[in-house]
Amino acid sequence: LGLSVARSWDGGIMFDTGDGIIEVFDDGESPLPQGNIRHFAFATEDVDACVLAVRKAGYEVFVEPKDIEIQSDPKFPARIAFCRGPLGEEIEFFCEK
């Protein structure tokens, strides 16, 4: 596809699409049934507001908002949170700091 690498780390890589990011990583788990998605992420300006909306809609938040730093090249400081979608998929909200 000709995408440039935005960041990489052991077991993962982010590709720059021009107006977004595609993250690919090895999660070490068994394959999902055809048509299922295990994880996807949304970039947002306000992770905490997204979590409030998720809770209000009645969905499970299983990683509360927190600040992290992915040891990628270059390093990636971010605020993240995870919830479960209606089909059990993991939905990540993140904001680069």
What are these regions (language model features)?
Residues 1-22, 49:
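Core segments of cupin and vicinal oxygen chelate
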Residues 5, 13-14, 31-32, 72-73:
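Short secondary-structure boundary/capping segments
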Residues 13-16, 32-97:
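Vicinal oxygen chelate
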Residues 21-24, 32, 89:
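Short, charged/polar, Gly/Pro-enriched secondary-structure boundary elements
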